[in-house]
């Protein structure tokens, strides 16, 4: 079988892993932009936003992809998985309520109120729902070792990235 160190190390190329992280971060940036420009691109009378923060830990992403695909993968191979994860992580709800209001003459008019909600189910909460037992234990091992690649996502560039020592006393919310 695999030697201990090999089975705890991410098997995919840096190009694939950095590419998957960039693709996922790109989807998040698009969502952020959609929300940031919401009022200027929609024409309702009133807006109410209830938005979770957008973001993820790149080590969680790569550990999920590696465990889910049970080994090495290319960016092409995980494109569908990235979409699936994104749809599970972010639930965007847009609801419009129309109220009848009356002007100073007492004439009725419609007032459109838009409620926008973004729910972020942290990426680290998804493995238990999408993986079998074997995949899940692979995921846990990769997270414990950070795939033996603490250099892959430096905190300076990836503020949400796990750090090796910090992981061990990480509390599950």
PLM region descriptions:
Residues 1-172:
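Membrane-proximal envelope biogenesis segments
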């Amino acid at each position: 079988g695999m030697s201990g160190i090999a089975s705890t190390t991410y098997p995919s190329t840096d190009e694939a892993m950095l590419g998957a992280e960039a693709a996922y971060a790109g989807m998040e940036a698009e969502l952020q932009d959609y929300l940031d420009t919401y009022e200027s691109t929609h024409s309702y009378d009133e807006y109410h936003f209830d938005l979770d923060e957008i973001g993820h830990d790149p080590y969680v992403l790569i550990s999920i992809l590696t465990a889910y695909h049970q080994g090495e993968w290319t960016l092409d191979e995980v494109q569908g998985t990235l979409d699936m994860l994104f749809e599970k992580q972010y639930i965007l709800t847009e609801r419009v309520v129309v109220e009848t209001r009356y002007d100073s003459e007492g004439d009725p008019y419609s007032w459109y109120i838009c409620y926008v909600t973004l729910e972020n189910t942290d990426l680290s909460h998804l493995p238990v729902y999408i993986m079998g037992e074997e995949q899940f234990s692979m995921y846990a091992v990769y997270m414990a070792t950070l795939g033996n690649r603490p250099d892959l996502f430096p905190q300076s560039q990836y503020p949400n990235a796990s750090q090796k020592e910090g992981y061990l006393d990480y509390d599950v919310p």
